[in-house]
Amino acid sequence: MTDQAPVTYAGPPRVLSGVQPSGALHLGNYLGALVKFTRLQHEIDTFIFVADLHAITVWQDPAALAQQTREIAAAYIASGLDPDKATIFPQSAVREHAELSWIFNCVARLGWLDRMTQFKEKSGKHKERSSVGLYTYPVLQAADILIYKATHVPVGEDQKQHLELTRDIAQKFNHDFNAPGFFPLPDPLIQGPGARVMSLRDGSAKMSKSDPSDYSRINLTDTADDIAAKVKKARTDPEPLPETIEELATRAEADNLVGIFAALAGKTKAEVLADYAGKGFGTFKPALAELAVESLAPVGERMRGLLGDPAVLDAILAKGAEKAREAAAPTLAEVKKLVGFWGA
C-alpha cells in the first residue's frame, strides 16, 4: 500500500520497543537497543516491554520463562532505564495486545504475510512444522505498537519490513472503518553506531545468544575478567589497523572490533582509526578490553543485585503493566466501537 495523507495522526509522540526473554542478553543487545532506550526515555514518552508472547512462537521452557522475563527487566534497569520515566512491563500482562492482534489478523492480507522474509529465515526447511504464531508474529508486532498509538519504533535491518507491515495495517484499518488518522503510521528510529554487533569469533555473523561458543559474545552478566578474556581472544587478522573506513570495511573482524570501540566510546569509526591507525591488535585489544570492562561490568553488577531481589523486580513489572493497561484499554475500546462489536 502507498501512504495517503489527507488526515494525519494528531496524538502525542510515543516510542515503543521490546526484547524477547529467550536467552541471556549480550553486548549486541546493549549497544543495539538498551543504550538507545535509555537515551529515548529523556526525550519522548517511552514504553519498553518484555516480549514474552513473541518468545513462545518457538518452544520456551515454562519453568524458566518467568525468570527469563525478570532477567530482561533487570537488564533494562541495570542499563539505565528508569521505571519512573519509562513504562516497563511484560507483554503477556496486557491482554489488549492479543485482542488487537486478532482484529489485525482480520485486517492484514495473506499476501502481505507471505512476503515477510523473517518467517522464511526462521522456519527454514521445516515451514510446515512451524507454529502459526511464528507466521503471524508481525501482526502481533503491529498490535504491540498500535495499541499504544506509538509514533516511533527503534528498528534494525531485520525489522524494517515488519514496521512497513504495521504501517499498512494501520492505514487499512483507518480506511476500512472510516477513521482517518485514528492510528498513526509509525516512523522508524534508525539505529546508528552499534546497531549491528558481530560475533567475536566470526565477523560475518551477527552476535547471537544461540551461538554455541560463549566466546562469540560478551554477555551482560559477564564479570570483568570474562569480558577482558573474550576481547583478548576475539578473532582478528595479522595486519595493523588501516587509516581509512574504506580499508576497514574489507576486514570483517577488524571492522567489528573498531565498531564496538566506537559505540562504547561514543565516537565514529573514523575517530577511532585516527587514534589507532598503524597500530596492531596487541595495542588495540587491551584498550578495547579496558573500555568494555568500564562500560559493561557495572551493568552486570547491577543486574546481579536486582535479580537477587525478585520481589522488587516483580513490583516494578506489575506497576508497569498497570500503567500500560491504562494506556491500552481506551484504544481497544475505541477499536471495538469502530469494528461494531456488541456492547462496545
From Swiss-Prot:
Broadest EC class assigned to this enzyme: ligase
Single annotated GO MF: ATP binding
CDD domains: TrpRS_core
Record's subcellular location: Cytoplasm
Gene Ontology cellular-component annotations: cytosol
Sequence motif: 'HIGH' region, positions: 21-29
Record-listed ATP binding positions: Q20, P21, S22, G28, N29, G156, E157, D158, V197, K206, M207, S208, K209, S210
Motif range ('KMSKS' region): 206-210
GO biological processes: tryptophanyl-tRNA aminoacylation
InterPro entries cross-referenced by the UniProt entry: aa-tRNA-synth_I_CS, aa-tRNA-synth_Ic, Rossmann-like_a/b/a_fold, Trp-tRNA-ligase, Trp-tRNA-ligase_bac-type, Trp-tRNA_synthetase
Reaction catalysis annotation: tRNA(Trp) + L-tryptophan + ATP = L-tryptophyl-tRNA(Trp) + AMP + diphosphate + H(+)
SS bond list: none
Residues where L-tryptophan binds: D144
Enzyme Commission identifier(s): 6.1.1.2
Superkingdom in the source lineage: Bacteria
SUPFAM superfamilies: Nucleotidylyl transferase (SSF52374)
This protein's UniProt keywords: Aminoacyl-tRNA synthetase, ATP-binding, Cytoplasm, Ligase, Nucleotide-binding, Protein biosynthesis
Summary of the function given for this chain in its UniProt record: Catalyzes the attachment of tryptophan to tRNA(Trp).
PANTHER family reported for this sequence: TRYPTOPHAN--TRNA LIGASE, MITOCHONDRIAL
Quaternary structure note: Homodimer.
Similarity section: Belongs to the class-I aminoacyl-tRNA synthetase family.
Protein name stated in the entry: Tryptophan--tRNA ligase
Organism expressing this protein natively: Caulobacter vibrioides (strain ATCC 19089 / CIP 103742 / CB 15) (Caulobacter crescentus)
